[in-house]
């Protein structure tokens, strides 16, 4: 069950660029609630609180209850914009969630047992190819993260989407069996493999020469005179 957070907001009587700039000058962030077959509702949120929510992480997968004039709106953020220079929030889009709604979200991947993976112990490096997985699930069941166990990976081996144990009711959107994690070989690993292969091939050849010489010494001498 996803955790539902409270978020304070006030209704905006006006929309448009001029009204939005006025909200920002007053220390509030203009936003809108839309969806669920209802008209859009312009709102504003206190900038410090909203910035704290965004910086806390997983903002786009967190469900919020917004109370407006005594009516509670259950929403999820679908998009937000930051000031390109000062990096503070300047607008947020919230989508209403109806009862039993399903939603598509991008859930971050969390690695397990990376430090005990055989490939890591042999000097390899964990390469996180896919940082998040796009899934579909009930809005009330959005996982905070999806776990990926890499504890058995060797050097040059990979973990794919089909290797994951997804939570019940969570379905991946990707049709391909995408690569999630790989163990990158350490520097010089390819040369070590070539040297080991060459040494392995040379060993049987070196052992064959003395054996051939010994066999020749035991063979009877040919070409001698026969008794008549």
Swiss-Prot record:
Any single biological process term in GO: translation
Tagged with keyword Hydrolase: no
An example molecular function term from Gene Ontology annotations: 5S rRNA binding
InterPro entries cross-referenced by the UniProt entry: Rbsml_bL25/Gln-tRNA_synth_N, Ribosomal_bL25/Gln-tRNA_synth, Ribosomal_bL25_b-dom, Ribosomal_bL25_C, Ribosomal_bL25_long, Ribosomal_L25_dom, Ribosomal_uL5_bac-type
Record keywords: Ribonucleoprotein, Ribosomal protein, RNA-binding, rRNA-binding
Annotated region described as Disordered, given as residue ranges: 1-24
Domain of life where this protein originates: Bacteria
Signal peptide: none
PANTHER family, per database record: RIBOSOMAL PROTEIN L25/GLN-TRNA SYNTHETASE, ANTI-CODON-BINDING DOMAIN-CONTAINING PROTEIN, RIBOSOMAL PROTEIN L25_GLN-TRNA SYNTHETASE, ANTI-CODON-BINDING DOMAIN-CONTAINING PROTEIN
Protein purpose: This is one of the proteins that binds to the 5S RNA in the ribosome where it forms part of the central protuberance.
Name of protein: Large ribosomal subunit protein bL25
The encoding gene: rplY
